[in-house]
Amino acid sequence: MVAGWQSVLDRHAELFSEIEEEASLAIVPRRFVAPVCDPVPMLLWVREPDGMAARTGQFGGFKALSSDLLLIANDGTLEQALSGNEPLAEIKRQLRAGGMLFMVLRRKDELREHGWEDFLEWLGMPFLGACR
Amino acid sequence: MTELTHLFKPGRLGRYPTRNMIKYGACCVSNYNTRDGFITPRELARVRVIAGTGCGIITNQGAYPDPKGEGKSYFRQVALYDDKFLPQFETIARYIHDAGSVAIQQILHAGRYGGIDLGYCVQPSVVPQTLPHFRPPREMSKDDIRRCIREHVEAAKRAIKAGFDGVEVTSFMGYLLASFNSKFTNQRTDEYGGSLENRGRFMRELIDGVKQALPEHPLIVRLNGAELMDQWGGNTEDECFELMEQAARAGVDQISVTVGWQEAPESSIGRDIAPGHWNYLATRAKKTCPGTQIAFGNRLPDPDMANDCIGRGEFDVWEVCRPLLADPQLIHKAAEGRLDEVRRCIGSLNCLSRLFRDLPYSCTMNPALGHEVEPEYAITPAAVKKKIMVIGAGPAGMEYAITAAKRGHAVTVYEKGERIGGNLYAFAAHDLARPEDLMSVVRHYEVMAKKLGVEMKFNTEANAKLMRSVLHQYDVCVVASGARIDMEAYAGIDGRERLLDALDVAHGRVQAGKRVVVIGGGKIGLVLAESLRKNGAEVTLVERDKRIAGDVMPTFKWRHTTWVEELGIPVHTSARLKRVTAEGAFIVDGKGKETLLPADSVIAAGPRKANQELFTEFEWMVDELHGCGDALMPRGMDAAIHGGYRLGVRI
């Protein structure tokens, strides 16, 4: 799984080129998501000097999470995305279909400072919302 | 006279009679006020227009009730947490009463979407935001909840003190009340969370508090019929209706049924949603709460349709706002059987696009909106009646023409095509959302040109020869000749003679093949690419920029990117055209890599260039020479309409 996502991140390096070192996005199965919980495995996309790296980590609830962004996935959704031709496009599709949910753990200006603007724009996040 | 008998029958809200079954909904905060919550002259002038709309009930835009500003969601939202704000509220209540309507003040505590001037927002539970626009959450303690209810009650009392007849508390779009009601955001384990009964406790206590304080005055709540958040753990529609029952039992006088949250993954009120789509929610509310008045208006812009719904008993009151932003005379026109003259809301959501950038709202279709305080924006009789020629019957030219005609000028429009609309007509023909909305703009100009006696000369190319033939017949010439695709921008491209012009394709003057490459991922390229793909062509899109849809209205960008994905249109961004051959288009990406995109048609959809040649040609041939719309600077329909109007009120 980690190797698979590493390959996806490498293929889309341009989306993450502006991200500050150590800024990260966490991906957690929906059933574990709570403000505080017993540690469960999570997937992390962390910016390292050479680019975005896929890693595993421990999720103890979003209150203690140091990541900037949290992607919550229904069971099987992440695996399904990874098995397709365009995993990132599938994430985008799942966000609109409700199979995944995106949570923002920093203020907009902090996200911008940390370099997430391109990725968020690509996901279409600034323009989501029923009021449209 | 009107045949809309259900809409125009007298009604009642609490103890107050209403002259019809139409309510002006507080759909949008204007952002016209001061940063610290005081109402400005700009707002008062705007509200005077709202008061004159003819609605039986008029709701003034939402005021935040707390001094900290936790409830404040918009940059220049009005406040009602202190008596110091009352003088302007008194003026507004008086305007509404003078116009013969029932005056309602909305209280808007934005909760999850609030705290715009703070570093946080308040919520029943800490559930992180899903949209970057909003502030990180803090959980409300029980003391906070009690204080918040008290602040709502005090704000309600203050509104009545200012002269309003009743108040409305809104849970529209995920505001505080909605986030207590929803299991997505309410994950509390105390008596305010958990079961539906507990989640509704905040709402019931709030209703009870206001009703106890103001038993003689109507109280309205706006509640979601559908949150559109159920896939993310929000309330189901069944739960939404159970909460409505709770509100009805708690004694509210009217329930206003709304749809969706700001952060819902679906849209609810944009152009891609068909009018009437959400009516079933109002029908269900009426059945669920038979003893409570039900108001509804989401994506229901048409008075005829609303009249029929009321006639069938689907809801009681038509709640309308955006259509009245587009045309404040809508109700009067409906009452007088002049619906053909109505300037329709086209659902472009320019209003919201601007709000989310902390700008005052404006309306694509109503250039005077927000400028009511400025005499320069009013249509007044011209001091000198002039003979005016307009070159081009697109939105800019027609907007100018009808505005000038209203002022008493004699206007003739010269159009090289055979109809009104210019490139908008072609754009509408290929629009995947709702072509009828865009066509309503064209129809409005057709009707008004006829009614105002604007002379239309179609199939007439404007050039120096034409100008010589009419020399000294006109006092003013307005060049509104639009823009074209700048084919000269491709001068260095081998095989450029093979390129098709996107506007020729859009107008049907040229037929594209079955394998198409569109150069330019702005709105012209996108609309054409989507339409061609939908009609069976294989289409590839090439864009120089990092992203497509750069010139698209922010509230509609997502729609194009989604269509592109759904239709399976490959997109090459940061790429430029290198040459065109019989095989197709050769493009080069940011790293210099060349790729052949096989195609039988390569369409240039950008850049655009203003058609300004006539300015030079006509310079010494007419007394006054002006320009408006894309002929000055290619921008889009809003700028064209607004530019045409501003010139129209001035000359």
Segments from the language model and where they lie:
Chain A
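Feature captures hydrophobic
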Residues: 1-132
